[in-house]
Amino acid sequence: MPAPYKPGSEKKGATLFKTRCLQCHTTEKGGPHKVGPNLHGVFSRQSGQVSGYSYTDAMINRNVTWDAQSMSDYLENPKKYIPGTKMAFGGLKKEKDRNDLITYMLKACK
């Protein structure tokens, strides 16, 4: 079981997002979907529910409501958390990296 989420460095999280996530995701309201869905408003949203993006059945049926902890659990190993996800990213194994990234995402994805 992944470690509990603890707020981290927003600045380091922004760098992680830029180097690990930005090639597939956008965060701004009304931003386009890329390989992955736009993440604006992801927190408090149910998995697989952004209109205009084609999710796998696995993501839709996982029925998770995203919060900091569920996002941390997912980002540690996406294919283990949701077998059948099409997210190619292998995950962030370091707890600190996940905490930093999620701290950034909580602000950037509002």
Curated annotation (Swiss-Prot):
PTM comment: Binds 1 heme c group covalently per subunit.
Q: Which SUPFAM superfamilies match?
A: Cytochrome c
Keyword presence, Transport: yes
Q: What is its main location?
A: mitochondrion
| Residue positions binding heme c | 21, 24-25, 87
BP term (GO), one: mitochondrial electron transport, ubiquinol to cytochrome c
Q: PTM N6,N6,N6-trimethyllysine: list the residues.
A: 79
User: Among the entry's GO cellular component annotations, what is one?
Assistant: mitochondrial intermembrane space
Keywords recorded for this protein, A-Z: Electron transport, Heme, Iron, Metal-binding, Methylation, Mitochondrion, Respiratory chain, Transport
| Pfam families reported in the protein's UniProt record | Cytochrom_C (PF00034)
What GO MF terms are annotated?
electron transfer activity; heme binding; metal ion binding
InterPro entries recorded: Cyt_c-like_dom, Cyt_c-like_dom_sf, Cyt_c_1A/1B
Q: What does the record give as the function of this protein? A: Electron carrier protein. The oxidized form of the cytochrome c heme group can accept an electron from the heme group of the cytochrome c1 subunit of cytochrome reductase. Cytochrome c then transfers this electron to the cytochrome oxidase complex, the final protein carrier in the mitochondrial electron-transport chain.
The name this protein goes by in its record: Cytochrome c
Tell me what organism the protein belongs to.
Eremothecium gossypii (strain ATCC 10895 / CBS 109.51 / FGSC 9923 / NRRL Y-1056)
Q: What is the lineage of its organism?
A: Eukaryota, Fungi, Dikarya, Ascomycota, Saccharomycotina
